[in-house]
Design a protein with these regions (language model features):
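Class II aminoacyl-tRNA synthetase catalytic cores and aaRS-like
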Residues: 1-520
């Protein structure tokens, strides 16, 4: 076959600059001021009238205002801009200009607008929606600015996690998702039929396998999904969530605690440095995050119980109740004044008043819920008995005493897992360590020093009514070069919830799985 008869190449060889994309990302506009660029994305919102339109375009990397004067574009472009609907896909070409007033600090003076994909009646409009509606439309709600910001921060947290461990010589390893044994108790296992009539379970934790890998590689961490068939409908619980679990050979409890606090501080600092725009989009008060410096306060379980039952805690809760009642009264007074003003107001003022009323109603609902809960939390704290595990409400109250995460250590052995080492100075206690996030968010890390005594572990497996044969491989770790070792697990979604200021973990993972939700 002659060259003339050869088919045209499928791929263009013209990639001397190494680029793949033939368009510009919104996050890169700072590099193109006074240049003409082409953007591709979706219409987030719009406004304007007469001979000018303001289109807010989003592309996953950010948001930008595109200014479309009718006299600066051709008829086809104006027809698109004048009739475009929310979430239509667009290609927009124009000149980049810096403008501090615009979203992201830049805007596009448009030369041309082309529709790539039409949008129908988009259900998730800018108005207020109930949480059930939003969760039913989670696949679309993810496109909103708030959810964009949460997922961008989640991504930065994930990259910060890998940075932290890789810089410290850890090996990332992978634990199995299908297991033949329980880790955190049999009552929360998702079980399924395996081959040859054997039972298998979705993993509750990668910790046991992490211990095996720590004995092979020294310092390891796993990063994967975990599953708990726990019928809890609280703001902190999911049935499927992601855990980061380091395991370290030759680490004792104190070394473990120091690593945990350095880890949390590193994550927070990474988000503060790199996610300013996203935190602002969420209206997150960063003053509390800026307090996250090591060392963290440390209290024993015994001291935590004393603090819960103290007069100081009772007075603190009473003061919160009083402050919330005052805030509620002020908000209701403002709402009444706004309703009086609204009757004589112009249309644009009415829109502002209506938007403010939505904010007031939402905050009043939050206050009323808190006022219903706080008396119960006070009673729970005042009557807390030694030997009980801290509930979410107890953790919330404890964190109100501190301006940064607090480390709680040495728990009653009965409330900790079978593999936890006992305190050599008090056999009632396990060498556990938890990290509680401030601002009422509670536990984000749980861990401790692992038991190394073979006979003790056998006794604990029997005491917890677990089948020893499925733990034979785990017990082998104590027979061949057993050493002191420790580890912990950080719940990714709880950490994202705290750092982003979300009230519920369901907003911190793209498609949450709860006891009430398996779709979308």
């Amino acid at each position: 076959m002659s060259d003339a008869d050869s088919p045209a190449p499928i791929l263009s060889p013209d990639r001397e600059d190494g680029t793949i994309e033939d368009f510009t990302r919104i996050e890169d506009l700072a590099d193109h001021v006074d240049e003409t660029v082409t953007l591709k994305g979706w219409l987030h919102n719009q406004r304007g009238s007469g001979g000018i339109k303001f289109l807010i375009l989003r592309d996953g990397s950010g948001f930008v205002q595109c200014v479309v004067p009718q006299d600066a574009v051709d008829a086809d472009s104006w027809a698109v801009a004048d009739d475009v609907r929310q979430e239509a896909a667009l290609e927009i070409t124009g000149s980049v200009s810096a403008d501090e007033r615009a979203p992201g600090g830049y805007e596009l003076q448009v030369d041309a607008v082309e529709r790539i994909g039409e949008s129908g009646d988009y259900p998730v409009t800018p108005k207020e929606h109930g949480i059930d509606f939003l969760m039913e439309h989670r696949h679309l709600w993810l496109r909103s600015e708030s959810q964009w910001a949460v997922m961008r921060i989640r991504n930065r947290i994930e990259t910060a996690i890998h940075e932290f461990f890789q810089e410290r010589g850890f090996l990332q390893t992978d634990a199995p998702i299908l297991t033949g044994n329980a880790v955190e108790g049999t009552s929360t296992l998702f079980d399924l039929d395996y081959f040859d009539d054997e039972n298998a379970y979705l993993t509750q934790s990668g910790q046991l396998h992490g211990e095996a890998m720590a004995m092979a590689y020294g310092k390891v961490y796993t990063f994967g999904p975990t599953f708990r068939a726990e019928k809890s409908a609280t703001r902190r619980h999911l049935t499927e969530f992601w855990m980061i679990e380091p395991e370290m050979a030759f680490y004792d409890l104190e070394m473990n605690a120091q690593l945990a606090e350095d880890f949390v501080a590193h994550i927070v600092q990474a988000v503060l440095e790199d996610c300013e725009e996203e935190l602002e989009a969420l209206d997150r008060d960063t003053s509390a995050l800026e307090q996250v410096e090591t060392p963290f306060p440390r209290i024993s379980y015994d001291e935590a119980v004393e603090l819960l039952r103290s007069d100081e805690t009772a007075e603190m809760i009473d003061e919160r109740i009083e402050a919330l009642n005052e805030e509620k009264a002020e908000l209701l007074e403002e709402k009444e004044e706004n309703q009086t003003r609204r009757g004589q107001a112009k249309k644009h003022v009415k829109r502002k008043i209506d938007a403010r009323e939505i904010e007031i109603n939402k905050r009043v609902d939050e206050i009323e819920e808190a006022l219903r809960n706080l008396p119960d939390w006070k009673e729970s704290a005042q009557t807390f008995e030694w030997g009980e595990d801290f509930g979410g409400d107890d953790e919330t109250v404890l964190t109100w005493h501190f301006d940064r995460p607090v480390i709680v250590h040495r728990f009653p052995a009965e409330i900790k897992a079978f593999y936890m080492k006992r305190d050599p100075d008090d056999d009632r206690l396990a060498m556990g360590v938890d990290v509680l996030a401030p601002e009422g968010y509670g536990e984000i890390i749980g861990g401790g020093e692992r038991a190394t005594d073979l006979d003790f572990l056998k006794e604990q497996i029997e005491a917890h009514d677990l089948p020893e044969d499925v733990f034979d491989w785990y017990l082998d770790l104590r027979k061949f070069g057993s050493v002191p070792h420790s580890g912990f697990g950080l719940g990714l979604e709880r950490t994202v919830s705290w750092i982003t200021g979300r009230d519920h973990v369901r907003e911190t993972i793209p498609f949450p799985r709860t006891i009430a939700r398996l779709h979308p």
